[in-house]
Amino acid sequence: MPVTVNAFEDLVSHRQIADFMGSVMVERLLDLAIARADDFAPTSVGNGGGGTVSPDIRASLLLRDLGELRSELETRFAAVLDDTVRELRLSDIALHSLELELVAHNEGAFYSEHIDTFTARPDAQSDRALTGVYYFHRNPKGFDGGELRLHAIAPAADGTRSFTDIAPTCDTFILFPSWVPHEVRRVSCPSGAFADSRFALNCWYRSAR
């Protein structure tokens, strides 16, 4: 009798693009983050809209206003959508918009396992379909940890559940379907200096309903 494999037990493919923005953009992003350090606010969790600050689930700092860099970032992120859909064998994404945020993870910061799709917004005109995470940081790197852990949806018959850890390498862009369970592993930043944080630009490709 043939053995069947439950697809939910397997890891979903992701795409990893090294040297995505280049050193000049990395420096521009670092300059933005450091200059706007006082404007970062605690991250929240929740089903879109106004979330709740829950440091036992998510501990990090967030900036949504990317100023004059936003348009250039959107152009760069949008340029890889079609190739990513083909490489990951996803259904076509009718791009409605890009949702961007800049997140800083410092000493002890993390984000527990979650998915990026929302289910309780029937009035929304679009949904998160593809998640992108772009990493940058100061050199030499001032933190350890902070890996992106991608999980299989379900455990295998023996109770084990597959996962893979992706290091937050500077100038690397990671893409995966927004419904994939994932987490940010805890960060160690001995100096505690904001400039030594693990910085990430989260980009959600929103598909029109």
For each feature predicted by the language model, list its residue ranges:
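A short glycine-rich, His/Asp/Glu-containing loop-to-beta-strand
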Residues: 98-111
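Short, conserved beta-strand element in jelly-roll/cupin
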Residues: 102-104, 121-142
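A short coil-to-beta-strand element that immediately follows conserved catalytic motifs
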Residues: 88-100, 144
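Non-heme Fe(II)/2-oxoglutarate
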Residues: 2-88
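Catalytic core of Fe(II)/2-oxoglutarate
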Residues: 128, 144-209
